[in-house]
Amino acid sequence: EVKKALLDAGLSEKNVNAWLSDVKDYNKTIKNTGLVKKGFKKLSTKNPQYDENKIMELWNKKYPDFIGYNCRITAFDLMKDKISVKADAKVNASNLFMDQDALKHAPAKKFTKKQKHAFETLYSTLNTAYTTDVDTHIKKQKKAWKQNEVKISGTKASLITVVFHSSFGKNENELSIGHAGVLVPTKDKKLLFVEKLSFSLPYQVLKFDNRKQLNHYLMGMYDTSWGQEEAKPFIMENTNLMKDYRVIRKDK
C-alpha cells in the first residue's frame, strides 16, 4: 500500500525500492523490536515508544561504524530526483555533521556529489533574528531557499520539514531543520507520512485524514522546549508554510 502510494505520487521506482530495502535491512537488524506486525495501528494520544537500548545494541552488533540513516537522509533519498538547487548555492552544513558521518560509513553510496550538494543546501543552517516571532523565521527560511533556488517539482509527494529556532543569545540565532518526512496522498483521500524517527529509531509510516492531524502529531513531537527565548518550531511543505500549520501548545 505504501509503495503504491509513493509510486502513484510520481516518485521513482528506484528510490522507492532503495527505501524499502533500507527499511527491511533496518527491521531485520533490530529483529523487529517494538514494530507493528502488519498494517496500521491506531496512534494513541502518546506517540509510539520504542526500546532504544535494545535497538542500539542489535544495530551496533551489525554496524559498529554506521549510525544508520536519519529523517533528513531518508526523506531526501526518496525525493532526490525531484529536488534541485543552485549549483553555487551557499551552504552551512554545521548541523549536518552526523548526517555526513552516516553517509560516509553507509553500506552503500547514497548520493552523487551533485545530490549531496542539494542535500546540504536544502538542510542548511541559517542565521536568523533574535525573536520568538515565528513569522520572522518563516520569511527567513523561505528567502534562503529562494536565493539558493531550492525547487521541488514533478511529484504529488511533498517534503515536510520541521524548522527549529535555536537562540544562543542576542547575536547568535539559527534556524535548522530538525525533522523531515515525505507526505503522499492515497487513493482514499488520506495522507501517508513517511519518516525515519532518528538514526537509531525506526522507520514509520503514519496515516492521517488531513494536514491538521499531521500538524498535531508533529507539533506534539517537536514543540517541546519550555521557557526558552526561542520561537516555536514551524512546518514547511516543500518551500512554503504547510497549510493548517498552527501552534497547539500555548505557553503560559
Where on the chain are the PLM-derived regions?
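Cysteine-nucleophile amide-bond enzymes
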Residues: 1-252
